[in-house]
């Protein structure tokens, strides 16, 4: 069980890296993409959506740090923290990557853009060691 927890922490850290990359690349892209004579990053609705992406990745980062500390100190709540982390990673990862693809339009799913690859990676990671539904159920039973 400890090995599964450590592996889950590792893939969660990787997922947070993917989410952060999606956010950073989206911000860069929206600054360079122009519509109606101005960068699309100037539109408030898109700014709010990008802030949501940032918040989702920061929530996951905080849960990762909490789970790492509890696994290190061998507290009885480490399984619960790891399940909370994995459930949130599954939900937030897909949300952030799907939003990034939407910002990039059709280019977001092309092989030339890394955003589509991050989406595929985050969907695959959700299935490893139990998906978000599995960990939500496990969390509620602990």
Features from the language model and the residues they span:
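Alpha-helical interface subdomain recognition
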Residues: 2-142
